[in-house]
């Protein structure tokens, strides 16, 4: 009888059983969550790929449309006048010691607080007037798709909780702009380049670009571009300056 009692397996304490059950439940819950996240990421990658493909098609159509319109105008013996640009890229090229408060205020509104800071600006009557006020202190023009793409991918930082955060992951964009349907870098580029309905929100999300000093230096910062200097509107030639500074 004593031998039987000695061989009897001791019962597992109830508290230990509960801990094991809780651990197993937590593990199952964690695995389920990881599986759901994996499935979500896969679906997001597919959406991003499809959007990138659609944007590429749209950009190609826009380019071909311009070529076609110019060709038709030439054929009819006319000059083709492209539509007024809607987007500018503005770079601050000079300091502001001793300048008027008005100039200082406009540079702050454009978020150009440091030399070689750059920002995108939606062109309208009000913004063009602002650019004219600070023209001696800035270089600006009309960026092409490559410039917008390269700036955002190479020097794109987001304003997240008032901090400058590198946009290394689409999840950062999705968390801040997902409610607008903007979930990836290609969405940001498209919204900026086409000056979409959410341009202001997306542009404010982007931290001002911190560019490098241009390779080869600046010629004459105080002289307008049309007179052989660096300041003012250089239209599509801004793309060459962006390449030198990016």
From Swiss-Prot:
GO CC terms, sorted: cytosolic large ribosomal subunit
Chain positions covered by the region annotation 4 X 12 AA tandem repeats: 7-52
GO BP term, example: maturation of LSU-rRNA from tricistronic rRNA transcript (SSU-rRNA, 5.8S rRNA, LSU-rRNA)
Annotated keywords: Acetylation, Cytoplasm, Repeat, Ribonucleoprotein, Ribosomal protein, RNA-binding
Sequence repeats: 7-17, 18-28, 29-40, 41-52
Domain of life: Eukaryota
Places the protein is found: Cytoplasm
Chief localization: cytoplasm
Modification N-acetylmethionine occurs at: 1
Signal peptide location: none
Homology family: Belongs to the universal ribosomal protein uL30 family.
The name this protein goes by in its record: Large ribosomal subunit protein uL30
Species this chain originates from: Gallus gallus
Lineage summary: Eukaryota, Metazoa, Chordata, Craniata, Vertebrata
């Amino acid at each position: 009888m004593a031998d039987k009692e000695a061989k009897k397996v001791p019962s597992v304490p109830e508290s230990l059983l509960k801990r094991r059950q809780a651990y197993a439940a937590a593990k199952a819950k964690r695995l389920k969550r990881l599986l759901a996240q994996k499935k979500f990421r896969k679906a997001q990658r597919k959406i991003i790929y499809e959007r990138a493909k659609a944007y590429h098609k749209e950009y190609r159509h826009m380019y071909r449309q311009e070529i076609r319109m110019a060709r038709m105008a030439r054929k009819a013996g006319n000059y083709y006048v492209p539509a007024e640009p809607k987007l500018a890229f503005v770079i601050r090229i000079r300091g502001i010691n001793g300048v008027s408060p008005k100039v200082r205020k406009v540079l702050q509104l454009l978020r150009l607080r440091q030399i070689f800071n750059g920002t995108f600006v939606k062109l309208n009557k009000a913004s063009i007037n602002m650019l004219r006020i600070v023209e001696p202190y800035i270089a600006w023009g009309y960026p092409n798709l490559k410039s917008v793409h390269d700036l955002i991918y190479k020097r794109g930082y987001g304003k997240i909780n008032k901090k400058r955060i590198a946009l290394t992951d689409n999840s950062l964009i999705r968390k801040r702009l997902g409610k607008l349907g903007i979930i990836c870098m290609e969405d940001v580029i498209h919204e900026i380049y086409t000056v979409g309905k959410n341009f202001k929100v997306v542009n404010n999300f982007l931290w001002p670009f911190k560019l490098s000093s241009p390779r080869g230096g600046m010629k004459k910062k105080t002289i307008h571009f049309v007179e052989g200097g660096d300041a003012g509107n250089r239209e599509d030639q801004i793309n060459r300056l962006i390449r030198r500074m990016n």
